[in-house]
Amino acid sequence: MKTVVLLTWISCWIDVCTSAQGRYAQKLLNDLMENYSSALRPVEDTDKTLNVTLQITLSQIKDMDERNQVLTTYLWIRQTWFDAYLKWDKEEYDGLEVIRIPSNLVWRPDIVLYNKADEEASGPADTNVVLRYNGEITWDMPAITKSSCVVDVSYFPFDWQWCNLTFGSWTYNGNQVDIAMGMDSGDLSDFVENVEWECHGMPAVRNVIMYGCCSDPYPDITYTLHLKRRSLFYIFNLLLPCFLISFLAPLGFYLPADSGEKVSLGVTVLLALTVFQLMVAESMPPSESVPYIGKYYIATMTMITASTSLTIFIMNIHFCGAEAKPVPHWAKVLIIDYMSKILFVYEVGENCTTPESERTPLYSEEPMSGNSALARNHYHDDLYHDGGCYQDDCHRLRPYQYGNGHLQNHHSTHQNHLDNCRYANGGHRDDHYSNRSNQNHHSNRSQTSKGEGGEEKREPLRHYHHIGREELDYQAPPPGNLQNGGLNEPLPYPKEKHLNPASAPACSCPCPHHKQVVYNIQYIANCFREQRATCAKGAEWKKVAKVMDRFFMWIFFIMVFLMSILIIGKAT
């Protein structure tokens, strides 16, 4: 029971004291505001300077507009001064030391942001002021400020920015209102980190400026924000794509010319870099200060333009063909002989360890397989062996006769004639050819017959001659001689001594079809030689183009790498 009574008495006493404090605060406010004017500077002597202490707390960096060069910040501004007309004896007011009243009831210094860039004019916030019994007034005011900031984007995205916030009295000179710094720098204890900028300090400096319009000094306090851009976002979204795309320009030289996509690749890369360049240009201020990333894009675009131009030039070389002049001697020595080895440009199946004697030429000299020389010698003897010719060979050489473009088999028709022609030039058989077996039934099948005395004899094997490529140097016949797939008019003999009329082997029987077949082979070989010479000339130009492609590919790789290292290294 006593406890309840005690608690009730304490609560009543607290209520009485609180109501007493409220009555004294109301009485104090009425006494202070009596005959008080907020329009006049609160000093007892008008010649005396009123000191105002300014302290800035940076809460947040809301935005940095590089294009318009405007910095938006969220600040807490604290101003402290002494009002000579707002003092009281705290003992007269029941020990009341502090009251909080609206700021519009008291005089406030007209301290503003000099480099304000806000389009809308806004006055100070009407927050309460804290009034102490000794006349000290503290005014805490939040403010979202937009200040002009000279942005230097030369080192974008590795740039530092120094933005100033200058505060001073707009109408009072230094003899009337003096501004002092509450701290040597801005307060960053409550700073909220920004996703794009890092704040590395906010030093303050007090300046006294003499303007040309006035003879009195005007003090101000300038806070300098040290901002560093967070570059990781721009590295992954602007620099790295550009770096990777720039390496596609040299790879355009490695793309085969026959693919038809070399120029398309260069143009596509150029368009991609143009898009990235526009993205950078839209975010940068239109000034003479070009960022290094912009220079990097321009340099890369220049290199891609040059590589595309060189690609067009090299493709013209690649597709020179037979109509072009032969490759100059200096180009063969410099490009084909030396540069191709340095740049490791070899034909299919070759490498840097292949001996010179084993390397495949641009086009094979013989259209035959590995043992072409041996086969040529054997067939050479087959047709003109020991200067003789068998009559049955003349007929066996043409088991099929061309007639009006159709093939007709005459094997059975000439069978009797073949029997009569056996051993026309002697009955012996060359042992060199008797050992050949399993050949074509028109050329290598042994024939047997009964001779005088009843003994069984073998007719000689058919001997054919293979015309070597070196023996077929002649002039191409006119197209008019070609009818129904063969030659109807006689052709001149080749110019080589092996096939001239004087040295040609004589046949005991006239064989015009045999001679016509030889002439047809000569014409086909001549066409093949001309085609091979044309292909060889085009192949030389193609190899020149391939070596130049490989040379410019490495040159551009080195240039892109060095340019990237120099520009990025200088920017960082």
From Swiss-Prot:
Keywords: Cell membrane, Disulfide bond, Glycoprotein, Ion channel, Ion transport, Ligand-gated ion channel, Membrane, Postsynaptic cell membrane, Receptor, Signal, Synapse, Transmembrane, Transmembrane helix, Transport. Residues 405-458 are annotated as: Disordered. Gene3D superfamilies: Neurotransmitter-gated ion-channel ligand-binding domain, Neurotransmitter-gated ion-channel transmembrane domain. Residues 435-447 have a biased composition (Low complexity). InterPro entries: Neur_chan_lig-bd (IPR006202), Neur_chan_lig-bd_sf (IPR036734), Neur_channel (IPR006201), Neuro-gated_channel_TM_sf (IPR036719), Neuro_actylchol_rec (IPR038050), Neurotrans-gated_channel_TM (IPR006029), Neurotransmitter_ion_chnl_CS (IPR018000), Nicotinic_acetylcholine_rcpt (IPR002394). Residues 1-19 form the signal peptide. It is found in: Postsynaptic cell membrane; Cell membrane. CDD domains: LGIC_ECD_nAChR_A9 (cd19022), LGIC_TM_cation (cd19051). GO terms for molecular function: acetylcholine-gated monoatomic cation-selective channel activity; transmembrane signaling receptor activity. It is a multi-pass membrane protein. Its main location: membrane. Disulfide bonds join C149-C163, C213-C214. Residues 20-232 are extracellular. Glycans are attached at N51, N164. Residues 318-550 are cytoplasmic. PROSITE patterns: NEUROTR_ION_CHANNEL (PS00236). The chain crosses the membrane at residues 233-253, 263-283, 297-317, 551-571. One of its GO terms (cellular component) is postsynaptic membrane. It comes from the Eukaryota. Expressed in the liver, olfactory mucosa, pituitary gland, hair cells of the saccule and spleen. The keyword NAD does not apply. Belongs to the ligand-gated ion channel (TC 1.A.9) family. Acetylcholine receptor (TC 1.A.9.1) subfamily. NCBIfam families: LIC. This is Neuronal acetylcholine receptor subunit alpha-9-I. The gene is nachra9.
